[in-house]
UniProtKB/Swiss-Prot annotation:
Pfam families: DXP_synthase_N (PF13292), Transket_pyr (PF02779), Transketolase_C (PF02780)
Associated pathway: Metabolic intermediate biosynthesis; 1-deoxy-D-xylulose 5-phosphate biosynthesis; 1-deoxy-D-xylulose 5-phosphate from D-glyceraldehyde 3-phosphate and pyruvate: step 1/1
Protein name: 1-deoxy-D-xylulose-5-phosphate synthase
NCBIfam families for the chain: dxs (TIGR00204), PRK05444.2-2 (NF003933)
One Gene Ontology cellular component: cytosol
Record GO biological process: 1-deoxy-D-xylulose 5-phosphate biosynthetic process; isopentenyl diphosphate biosynthetic process, methylerythritol 4-phosphate pathway; terpenoid biosynthetic process; thiamine biosynthetic process
Entry annotated with the keyword Electron transport: no
Substrates-to-products reaction catalysed: D-glyceraldehyde 3-phosphate + pyruvate + H(+) = 1-deoxy-D-xylulose 5-phosphate + CO2
Keyword annotations of the record: Isoprene biosynthesis, Magnesium, Metal-binding, Thiamine biosynthesis, Thiamine pyrophosphate, Transferase
Organism: Chlamydia trachomatis serovar A (strain ATCC VR-571B / DSM 19440 / HAR-13)
């Protein structure tokens, strides 16, 4: 495609210079640029394609950064980046080395007000900006998807909006989707509460008629979209009850109508809810047909067939830890006919789709409501029913009190399947799963473990149902280096606090958590080149530690290395030092983990080099710390 307009847009001021008639052409160029770039890098595709016209219209009518846009989940900000001076090589490398972040990032641009990686916070942040702002001429525009209304934080903020708040426009991008289809009463209610029951029934009849049209009519989805807009315009909306002036619904793919509507409401003296209807994946036929699979894509997605990220995918090599976990839960579901699985909007990412399909009555997606997911799971456990709450490490932070008060304090046997434990690499600082141990380890009654491979993962899941205590099974989103057995029994259950010696040596004791055991075994081989023999231990459990085994090993090992892909604060290293202190054991300990800094996005090799967790870096740090010889200066490898 020839780009006639986009190369000349270096700021919103350049956009303002265009005539209204040229905006549709610009939108086409932006949409093509996103598809072209993400076909090389991967990234969040469908949500950005659906928001092209809306974002262009917002920047055309308002003046960023004086007017402030706050995106609810910054992964829908690619168009915003292109319009604010970031249509550079860095955009072509988005989420990779030397590329832009996949989220809004103030360090990148003063047009990004907040770093936004988690959902549901935009309205609260925007209200805070409005409360503290001294610039009465500035507009504040939180931009929310309809899925954000399943998040309690959004509703709390909605409850606090002053009726006399001016120049405050809530933009509701209603595509009836989260990552997957919306769940729960509230997102569905945004549509159903908009118009009376009679109109709702009429809508169902019309949509049914459209679906029965011949398949060669490819515009069925567009026709359905226009019907939705027309019917919603007949109704009195829910949001008026919250003191908001409702405007909409507006066709989110008609940039001229969007501009005209925004110009009309720009200076109204009360808070406004601007309701826009869009189609997720708009402009790319495959993404429109299957917005779930095209929500986030891998590089070269146009040259390969996208595979479903579900539990029982074809047994291809390698299979990731989450895929193994999904398979194991399906097998557990067959063995334990009462087992319930709960997730906060991560059914697809955590490979739970097969469990959902096989056991729909025993699967609950609560939407973007992590606290509710945890406490809901606690209620299930209290009834005597086994339950697994599957949740990303980075999202578990949001439910810390629920874990403490509703699970651990009640001594309820909720199994937490903590996905994405470890570095997130391309998603960057908001998504790294490297902090959860800091609060989980402090909670009484909590058992915490991490497998090094699929076989240990399998044993931990099956064993956890026997422990009868709260437990957390952590695992990363990387290939597991061994296949699970795919059998029920017999298997050897693991008791909390059972570690495993992987190899024995005389000079060093290297304790490595989870998948870092692979790195530890490589380091052991490197150290052999220097005549150093190493005992490598997989602790399996962070809490409780295998005290008996450790005490035995420490009688003839005084040099110890702890290796983990977690913050050096509050993880395995901290637990081990506490163990030494409690037992009055003296040892020289080198604790290696993620340094106390926010880790940026980038390719795995780059990030591991940055933080010193490659096998070469680790070997050099061990040699330097224990003074086995004078190594290459460590500053060349690592800066904390």
């Amino acid at each position: 495609m020839t780009y006639s307009l986009l190369p000349h847009i270096h700021s919103p001021q350049d956009l303002h210079a265009l005539s209204l008639d040229k905006l549709p052409v610009l939108c086409d160029e932006i949409r093509n640029k996103i598809i072209e770039s993400l076909s090389l890098t991967g990234g969040h595709l469908a949500s950005n394609l659906g928001g092209v016209e809306l974002t262009v219209a917002l920047h055309y009518v308002f003046s960023s950064p004086d007017d402030q846009f706050i995106f609810d989940v910054g992964h829908q900000s690619y168009v915003h980046k292109l319009l604010t001076g970031r249509n550079t090589e860095a955009f072509s490398n988005i989420r990779h080395d030397n590329g832009l972040s996949g989220f809004t990032t103030p360090q990148e641009s003063n047009h990004d007000i907040f770093f936004s990686g988690h959902a549901g916070n935009a309205l609260s942040l925007a209200l805070g900006l409005a409360k503290g702002s001294s610039n009465s001429s500035s507009h504040i525009l939180p931009i929310l998807g309809d899925a954000a209304f399943s998040c309690g934080l959004t509703l709390e903020a909605l409850n606090n909006i002053p009726a006399d708040l001016s120049k405050f426009i809530i933009v509701l991008n209603d595509n009836q989707m989260s990552i997957s289809e919306n769940v729960g009463n509230i997102p569905q209610g945004i549509s159903h509460w908009m118009y009376p029951q009679k109109i709702s029934k009429l809508s169902q009849k019309i949509h049914s008629w459209i679906q029965n049209l011949p398949s060669f009519l490819h515009k069925k989805k567009t026709l359905s979209h226009k019907v939705d807009i027309a019917l919603k315009s007949l109704s009195h909306p829910l949001f008026e009850q919250f003191g908001l002036h409702y405007v909409g619904p507006i066709d989110g793919h008609n940039v001229k109508k969007l501009v005209q509507a925004l110009q009309m409401i720009k200076d109204q003296p009360q808070p406004i809810l601007f309701h826009v209807c869009t189609v997720k994946g708009n402009g790319l036929a495959e993404a429109e047909r299957d917005p779930i699979r095209y929500h986030g894509v891998k590089a070269h997605f146009q040259n390969t067939s996208l595979k479903k990220t579900s539990g029982n995918v074809e047994l291809q090599t390698p299979i990731s830890f989450p895929q193994h976990a999904g398979n194991i839960l399906c097998r557990l579901g067959k063995k334990y006919p009462q087992l319930q699985v709960v997730t906060p909007a991560m059914s697809l990412g955590s490979c739970l789709e097969d469990f959902r399909k096989q056991f729909p009555d025993r699967f609950t997606d609560v939407g973007i409501a992590e606290g509710h997911a945890v406490t809901f799971s606690a209620g299930i456990a209290r009834s005597g029913t086994p339950v697994c709450c599957s949740i990303y490490s980075t999202f578990l932070h949001r439910a810390m009190d629920n874990v403490f008060h509703d699970v651990c304090m009640q001594e309820l046997p909720v199994i937490f399947a903590i996905d994405r434990a470890g570095l997130a690499f391309h998603d960057g600082r908001s998504h790294h799963g490297i902090y959860d141990l800091g609060f989980l380890c402090s909670m009484p009654n909590m058992v915490i473990c991490q497998p090094r491979n699929a076989l240990v993962l399998e044993r931990l899941f099956f064993s956890s149902l026997l422990w009868k205590s709260p437990c957390a099974i952590r695992y990363p989103n990387i290939p597991a280096n061994e296949k699970a057995s795919n059998s029920f029994f017999p298997f050897s259950p693991i008791l909390p606090g059972e570690a495993e010696i992987l190899c024995q040596g005389d000079d060093l004791l290297l304790i490595a958590l989870g998948h870092m055991c692979n790195t530890a075994l490589t380091v052991k081989e490197h150290l052999l080149d220097y005549g150093i023999s190493t005992t490598v231990v997989d602790p399996i459990f962070i809490k409780p530690l295998d005290r008996k085994l450790l005490q035995s090993l420490l009688t003839h090992h005084s040099k110890v290395i702890i290796l983990e892909e977690h913050s050096i604060h509050g993880g395995l290293g901290s637990e081990f030092l506490l163990f030494l202190n409690q037992h009055n054991i003296k040892a020289d300990v080198l604790s290696l983990g993620v340094p106390d800094m926010f880790i940026p996005h980038g390719n795995p090799e780059t990030i591991l080099n940055l933080i010193g967790l490659t096998s070469d870096h680790i070997t050099q740090r061990i040699l330097s710390h224990f003074k086995f010889f004078t190594p290459i200066p460590i500053e060349r490898f690592f800066k904390a």
